[in-house]
A protein has these predicted regions:
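ABC-type ATPase nucleotide-binding domain
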Residues: 1-3, 110, 170, 176
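Conserved ABC ATPase "signature" region
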Residues: 8-28, 56, 137-141
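Short catalytic/signature loops enriched in Gly
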Residues: 24-27, 120-222
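P-loop NTP-binding/switch modules centered on Walker-like glycine-rich loops
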Residues: 54-63, 67-149
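Conserved ABC ATPase signature
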Residues: 32-37, 41
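ABC-type ATPase nucleotide-binding domains, specifically the catalytic core motifs of the NBD
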Residues: 1-9, 36, 119
Length: 222
């Protein structure tokens, strides 16, 4: 404990946090071992531990991994509730676009260790600017198209210890031929945008990307 409190005070605080995150009978459960808890309960305990010192920001790395849909919804609802109660920010790291759409306010999309697009969640889902972001959206399974093959992004991610000289996504990008410069394979694009709230890394002019992505987005959102 960073607060250097006494053992009795620390236990009281721990029980308070366990109760806050929805652990029943916290005094009893505090004496039990991890294997006696379900996956969802273990996740709640981890959240309680992170809240012990009333942080201003909570970093949640894949908090819903390996949880069934019902428990996943409970954990996300808990995080949203705690965000308001503690007046804190949450940095949520996840590969699940459904989770992103459900809880995020702003989104940073990363590829090969770099942010390739950042913006409000609605802009990311309804008006993406980065080819990689569009590729992710196209690969999401949809009930309305359960008989169609998923559109996977071709190729493989690059090695982080041997990145391409230019844009790391260039070898997999189907739009690089539309670039106004021959820089996709030689120059890494800067994080830019016509809006200060929505930016991306791409050599293809933004207005042309909107035009090229329009048909693809119609299929994704339809």
């Amino acid at each position: 404990m960073h607060n250097r409190g006494k053992k009795k005070e620390a236990m009281a605080r721990a029980l308070e946090m366990l109760d806050l995150v929805g652990i029943p009978e916290p005094a009893k459960r505090a004496q039990e071992f991890p294997h006696q808890f379900s996956g969802g309960m273990r996740q709640r305990v981890m959240i309680a531990m992170a809240l012990m010192n009333s942080p201003q920001i909570l970093i949640a790395d894949e908090p819903t991994t390996a949880l069934d849909v019902t428990v996943q919804a409970q954990i996300l609802a808990l995080l949203s509730k705690l965000k308001k109660e503690f007046n804190m920010g949450i940095l949520l790291i996840t590969h699940d676009l459904g989770v992103v759409a459900q809880v995020a306010d702003r989104v940073n999309v990363m590829y090969a260790g770099r942010i390739v697009e950042e913006g409000p969640v609605d802009d990311i889902f309804y008006s993406p600017l980065a080819p990689y972001t569009l590729g992710l959206l196209k690969s999401v399974p949809r009930v309305s198209k359960n008989n169609e093959r998923l559109k996977a992004i071709p190729g493989q991610p690059p090695s982080l210890i041997n990145l391409p000289v230019g844009c790391p996504f260039a070898p997999r990008c189907e739009y690089k031929q539309h670039s106004s410069e021959a820089g996709c394979n030689t120059t890494r694009p800067a994080l830019l945008g016509t809006s200060i709230t929505h930016r991306s890394r791409c050599h293809v002019p933004e207005n042309l990307r909107h035009e090229l992505f329009a048909k693809e987005l119609k299929e994704v959102q339809g």
